[in-house]
Protein backbone atom coordinates (compact mmCIF):
# COMPACT_ATOMS: atom_id res chain seq x y z
CA UNK A 1 0.00 0.00 0.00
CA UNK A 2 1.29 3.44 -0.96
CA UNK A 3 1.81 5.73 2.03
CA UNK A 4 0.29 9.17 1.36
CA UNK A 5 2.49 12.24 1.10
CA UNK A 6 0.95 15.46 2.40
CA UNK A 7 3.18 18.27 1.13
CA UNK A 8 2.90 21.99 1.72
CA UNK A 9 4.42 24.49 -0.70
CA UNK A 10 4.85 27.87 0.98
CA UNK A 11 6.01 29.56 -2.22
CA UNK A 12 7.37 33.07 -1.41
CA UNK A 13 5.73 33.51 1.98
CA UNK A 14 6.86 33.74 5.63
CA UNK A 15 9.98 34.93 7.41
CA UNK A 16 12.15 32.69 9.63
CA UNK A 17 10.31 34.02 12.72
CA UNK A 18 6.96 33.24 11.12
CA UNK A 19 8.25 29.78 10.23
CA UNK A 20 9.09 29.05 13.87
CA UNK A 21 5.68 30.32 14.97
CA UNK A 22 3.96 28.08 12.40
CA UNK A 23 5.65 24.93 13.65
CA UNK A 24 4.97 25.76 17.30
CA UNK A 25 1.25 25.51 16.46
CA UNK A 26 1.49 22.81 13.81
CA UNK A 27 3.58 20.17 15.56
CA UNK A 28 1.09 19.31 18.34
CA UNK A 29 -1.71 19.01 15.77
CA UNK A 30 0.04 16.29 13.75
CA UNK A 31 2.12 14.46 16.35
CA UNK A 32 -0.06 11.34 15.96
CA UNK A 33 -0.38 11.54 12.17
CA UNK A 34 1.60 8.40 11.37
CA UNK A 35 -0.68 7.46 8.46
CA UNK A 36 1.21 9.75 6.08
CA UNK A 37 4.48 11.51 5.32
CA UNK A 38 4.38 15.24 6.00
CA UNK A 39 6.65 17.49 3.94
CA UNK A 40 6.75 21.28 4.19
CA UNK A 41 8.64 23.31 1.59
CA UNK A 42 9.41 26.87 2.75
CA UNK A 43 11.53 29.45 0.88
CA UNK A 44 15.30 28.93 0.93
CA UNK A 45 15.70 31.63 3.60
CA UNK A 46 13.53 29.65 6.02
CA UNK A 47 14.97 26.17 5.52
CA UNK A 48 17.35 26.31 8.49
CA UNK A 49 14.59 27.53 10.82
CA UNK A 50 12.25 24.81 9.54
CA UNK A 51 14.80 22.03 9.96
CA UNK A 52 15.44 23.13 13.55
CA UNK A 53 11.71 23.39 14.25
CA UNK A 54 10.92 19.82 13.14
CA UNK A 55 13.91 18.18 14.81
CA UNK A 56 12.81 15.10 16.74
CA UNK A 57 9.63 14.70 14.69
CA UNK A 58 8.77 12.78 11.52
CA UNK A 59 7.99 16.00 9.62
CA UNK A 60 10.26 16.48 6.61
CA UNK A 61 11.50 19.73 5.11
CA UNK A 62 11.72 20.27 1.37
CA UNK A 63 13.03 22.99 -0.92
CA UNK A 64 11.16 24.56 -3.83
CA UNK A 65 13.93 24.18 -6.40
CA UNK A 66 17.43 22.75 -6.82
CA UNK A 67 20.31 23.53 -9.14
CA UNK A 68 21.41 20.88 -11.62
CA UNK A 69 25.11 21.31 -10.85
CA UNK A 70 27.06 20.32 -7.75
CA UNK A 71 28.66 23.77 -7.59
CA UNK A 72 29.86 26.51 -9.89
CA UNK A 73 29.12 29.92 -11.39
CA UNK A 74 25.33 29.68 -11.29
CA UNK A 75 24.16 32.91 -9.65
CA UNK A 76 20.93 32.48 -7.72
CA UNK A 77 20.97 28.67 -7.71
CA UNK A 78 21.23 26.36 -4.68
CA UNK A 79 22.76 22.92 -5.14
CA UNK A 80 21.73 19.50 -3.91
CA UNK A 81 24.73 19.11 -1.59
CA UNK A 82 23.94 22.48 0.01
CA UNK A 83 20.35 21.41 0.68
CA UNK A 84 21.37 17.97 1.87
CA UNK A 85 23.88 19.46 4.31
CA UNK A 86 21.11 21.58 5.84
CA UNK A 87 18.94 18.56 6.57
CA UNK A 88 16.53 19.04 3.67
CA UNK A 89 15.10 15.76 2.36
CA UNK A 90 12.74 16.69 -0.50
CA UNK A 91 12.59 19.20 -3.34
CA UNK A 92 9.78 20.38 -5.61
CA UNK A 93 10.83 20.37 -9.26
CA UNK A 94 9.02 21.74 -12.30
CA UNK A 95 6.20 23.55 -10.49
CA UNK A 96 3.94 25.36 -12.95
CA UNK A 97 5.00 28.74 -11.56
CA UNK A 98 8.62 27.86 -12.29
CA UNK A 99 7.61 26.89 -15.81
CA UNK A 100 5.46 30.00 -16.33
CA UNK A 101 7.61 32.73 -14.79
CA UNK A 102 11.16 31.38 -14.99
CA UNK A 103 11.13 29.49 -18.29
CA UNK A 104 11.58 26.08 -16.70
CA UNK A 105 11.41 23.39 -19.38
CA UNK A 106 10.90 19.64 -19.33
CA UNK A 107 14.58 19.30 -20.15
CA UNK A 108 15.71 21.34 -17.14
CA UNK A 109 13.18 19.46 -15.00
CA UNK A 110 14.96 16.24 -15.94
CA UNK A 111 18.39 17.73 -15.16
CA UNK A 112 17.25 19.03 -11.78
CA UNK A 113 15.58 15.72 -10.94
CA UNK A 114 18.73 13.77 -11.77
CA UNK A 115 20.81 16.15 -9.66
CA UNK A 116 18.42 15.89 -6.72
CA UNK A 117 18.62 12.10 -6.82
CA UNK A 118 22.41 12.14 -7.15
CA UNK A 119 22.69 14.17 -3.96
CA UNK A 120 20.21 12.22 -1.86
CA UNK A 121 17.07 14.32 -2.19
CA UNK A 122 13.56 13.04 -2.98
CA UNK A 123 12.17 14.95 -5.98
CA UNK A 124 8.49 15.88 -6.13
CA UNK A 125 8.21 16.28 -9.90
CA UNK A 126 5.26 18.37 -11.09
CA UNK A 127 3.26 17.91 -14.27
CA UNK A 128 0.05 19.62 -15.35
CA UNK A 129 -1.98 21.19 -18.13
CA UNK A 130 -3.36 24.65 -18.90
CA UNK A 131 -7.09 25.39 -19.03
CA UNK A 132 -6.91 25.60 -22.84
CA UNK A 133 -5.37 22.12 -22.90
CA UNK A 134 -8.13 20.74 -20.68
CA UNK A 135 -10.91 22.37 -22.68
CA UNK A 136 -9.30 21.31 -25.95
CA UNK A 137 -9.10 17.68 -24.90
CA UNK A 138 -5.29 17.74 -24.89
CA UNK A 139 -4.68 16.92 -21.22
CA UNK A 140 -3.31 13.42 -21.75
CA UNK A 141 -1.16 14.50 -24.69
CA UNK A 142 0.34 17.40 -22.71
CA UNK A 143 1.04 15.23 -19.68
CA UNK A 144 2.52 12.50 -21.88
CA UNK A 145 4.88 15.07 -23.41
CA UNK A 146 5.97 16.33 -20.01
CA UNK A 147 6.46 12.76 -18.84
CA UNK A 148 8.50 11.73 -21.88
CA UNK A 149 10.81 14.76 -21.74
CA UNK A 150 10.99 15.36 -18.00
CA UNK A 151 10.69 11.94 -16.36
CA UNK A 152 11.15 9.10 -18.85
CA UNK A 153 14.87 9.92 -19.10
CA UNK A 154 15.40 8.54 -15.60
CA UNK A 155 16.62 5.01 -15.03
CA UNK A 156 14.31 2.52 -13.34
CA UNK A 157 16.38 2.83 -10.17
CA UNK A 158 16.10 6.63 -10.24
CA UNK A 159 12.38 6.61 -10.99
CA UNK A 160 11.68 4.40 -7.97
CA UNK A 161 12.83 7.26 -5.72
CA UNK A 162 10.65 10.08 -7.04
CA UNK A 163 7.17 11.37 -6.24
CA UNK A 164 4.95 12.81 -8.99
CA UNK A 165 2.56 15.71 -8.41
CA UNK A 166 -0.28 16.39 -10.84
CA UNK A 167 -1.17 20.07 -10.69
CA UNK A 168 -3.78 21.29 -13.17
CA UNK A 169 -2.50 24.80 -13.82
CA UNK A 170 -6.06 26.13 -14.19
CA UNK A 171 -6.80 25.08 -10.59
CA UNK A 172 -3.78 26.66 -8.89
CA UNK A 173 -4.64 29.73 -6.84
CA UNK A 174 -7.93 30.13 -8.72
CA UNK A 175 -10.28 28.47 -6.26
CA UNK A 176 -11.16 25.98 -8.98
CA UNK A 177 -10.54 22.33 -8.22
CA UNK A 178 -10.63 19.34 -10.51
CA UNK A 179 -13.46 17.09 -9.40
CA UNK A 180 -12.25 13.99 -7.55
CA UNK A 181 -13.27 11.94 -10.58
CA UNK A 182 -11.33 14.13 -13.03
CA UNK A 183 -8.29 14.09 -10.76
CA UNK A 184 -8.47 10.31 -10.36
CA UNK A 185 -8.85 9.77 -14.11
CA UNK A 186 -5.82 11.96 -14.79
CA UNK A 187 -3.78 10.18 -12.13
CA UNK A 188 -4.79 6.88 -13.73
CA UNK A 189 -3.54 8.14 -17.10
CA UNK A 190 -0.21 9.20 -15.58
CA UNK A 191 0.13 5.81 -13.92
CA UNK A 192 -0.53 4.24 -17.31
CA UNK A 193 2.40 6.17 -18.79
CA UNK A 194 4.58 4.95 -15.94
CA UNK A 195 3.47 1.37 -16.61
CA UNK A 196 4.39 1.64 -20.29
CA UNK A 197 7.86 3.05 -19.58
CA UNK A 198 8.91 1.47 -16.28
CA UNK A 199 6.59 -1.53 -15.82
CA UNK A 200 3.70 -2.56 -13.60
CA UNK A 201 5.69 -2.77 -10.38
CA UNK A 202 6.89 0.82 -10.75
CA UNK A 203 3.39 2.01 -11.66
CA UNK A 204 1.88 0.32 -8.62
CA UNK A 205 4.54 1.79 -6.32
CA UNK A 206 4.87 5.41 -7.46
CA UNK A 207 2.99 7.99 -5.42
CA UNK A 208 1.07 10.57 -7.42
CA UNK A 209 -0.08 13.66 -5.52
CA UNK A 210 -2.84 16.08 -6.48
CA UNK A 211 -2.20 19.81 -6.29
CA UNK A 212 -4.70 22.49 -7.19
CA UNK A 213 -6.68 24.55 -4.65
CA UNK A 214 -6.63 21.77 -2.04
CA UNK A 215 -8.41 22.89 1.13
CA UNK A 216 -9.68 21.29 4.35
CA UNK A 217 -13.17 20.98 2.89
CA UNK A 218 -12.12 18.97 -0.18
CA UNK A 219 -9.10 17.03 1.08
CA UNK A 220 -11.10 14.08 2.39
CA UNK A 221 -13.01 13.47 -0.82
CA UNK A 222 -9.84 13.82 -2.90
CA UNK A 223 -7.98 11.40 -0.65
CA UNK A 224 -10.90 9.00 -0.97
CA UNK A 225 -9.85 8.33 -4.56
CA UNK A 226 -7.56 5.26 -4.66
CA UNK A 227 -5.45 6.79 -7.44
CA UNK A 228 -4.60 9.87 -5.34
CA UNK A 229 -1.65 9.25 -3.02
CA UNK A 230 -1.47 12.61 -1.30
CA UNK A 231 -1.66 16.32 -1.99
CA UNK A 232 0.61 19.25 -2.79
CA UNK A 233 -0.97 22.20 -0.99
CA UNK A 234 -0.32 25.89 -1.59
CA UNK A 235 -2.25 28.60 0.25
CA UNK A 236 -3.94 26.30 2.74
CA UNK A 237 -0.52 25.07 3.91
CA UNK A 238 0.38 28.52 5.25
CA UNK A 239 -2.00 28.19 8.18
CA UNK A 240 -1.08 25.51 10.75
CA UNK A 241 -4.66 24.63 11.65
CA UNK A 242 -5.75 24.49 8.02
CA UNK A 243 -2.85 22.32 6.91
CA UNK A 244 -3.18 20.03 9.93
CA UNK A 245 -6.82 19.53 9.01
CA UNK A 246 -5.75 18.45 5.53
CA UNK A 247 -3.06 16.14 6.91
CA UNK A 248 -5.59 14.55 9.25
CA UNK A 249 -8.23 14.13 6.56
From Swiss-Prot:
The keyword Metal-binding does not apply. GO terms for biological process: gluconeogenesis; glyceraldehyde-3-phosphate biosynthetic process; glycerol catabolic process; glycolytic process. CDD domains: TIM (cd00311). It comes from the Bacteria. Pathway: Carbohydrate biosynthesis; gluconeogenesis; Carbohydrate degradation; glycolysis; D-glyceraldehyde 3-phosphate from glycerone phosphate: step 1/1. Pfam families: TIM (PF00121). The active site is at 95 (electrophile), 167 (proton acceptor). GO terms for molecular function: triose-phosphate isomerase activity. One of its GO terms (cellular component) is cytosol. InterPro entries: Aldolase_TIM, TIM_sf, TrioseP_Isoase_bac/euk, Triosephosphate_isomerase, Triosephosphate_isomerase_AS. It catalyses: D-glyceraldehyde 3-phosphate = dihydroxyacetone phosphate. Keywords: Cytoplasm, Gluconeogenesis, Glycolysis, Isomerase. PROSITE patterns: TIM_1, TIM_2. It is found in: Cytoplasm. Substrate binds at residues 9-11, 173, 213, 234-235. Its EC number is 5.3.1.1. Involved in the gluconeogenesis. Catalyzes stereospecifically the conversion of dihydroxyacetone phosphate (DHAP) to D-glyceraldehyde-3-phosphate (G3P). HAMAP family: TIM_B. Belongs to the triosephosphate isomerase family. NCBIfam families: tim. This is Triosephosphate isomerase. It comes from Solibacter usitatus (strain Ellin6076).
